[in-house]
Amino acid sequence: MFAIVRTGGKQYRVAAGDKIAVEKIEGEAGDTVSLGDVLLAGDGGEVKDAKGLTVSAEIIAQTRGEKVIVFKKRRRHNYRRRNGHRQSLTLLRILAVGEARKAAPKKEAAPKEEAAPKAEAKAAAPAKEAAPKKEAAPKKAAAPKAEAAEKKPAARKAAPKKDA
């Protein structure tokens, strides 16, 4: 039996006993993870409904992929940048395909468990009743402004002296 699973933004065709390298999944060597995002399952030429199916896998090792050279250049500007990148990978051995989702493995592949408790905590916090708002005090009438002092004419500047 085979299955198409999605993990790390990529899709993999797996069967029991296969070894695959996927984007990093939290866990140590020997841990069992469950890949719950099964897109398609089948047996030979027969395609089955993938709802409720999971794929269980064992983590073989946490490793890093080959170095990829990232070279940037802008012609005629003397601009060259060379960087390397090594992607973190997890090597998995597929144990079983098509188990029911009720089986609880040691670790879950999806990190959605952490997001749920935070949402519940936020929902519990606004349960307190809001304090009643006080009525605004009535506005006082503005006091009339004192009449401005008598205006004086602007001082005149002395004329520049003439050279003889």
Curated annotation (Swiss-Prot):
UniProt keywords, alphabetically: Ribonucleoprotein, Ribosomal protein, RNA-binding, rRNA-binding
A biological process from GO: translation
Cited InterPro entries: bL21-like, bL21-like_sf, Ribosomal_bL21
Listed Basic and acidic residues bias regions: 101-121
Cellular component, GO, one term: ribonucleoprotein complex
Compositional bias (Basic residues): 154-164
Disordered, as annotated region: 101-164
Oligomer status and interactors: Part of the 50S ribosomal subunit. Contacts protein L20.
Record protein name field: Large ribosomal subunit protein bL21
Organism annotation: Sphingopyxis alaskensis (strain DSM 13593 / LMG 18877 / RB2256) (Sphingomonas alaskensis)
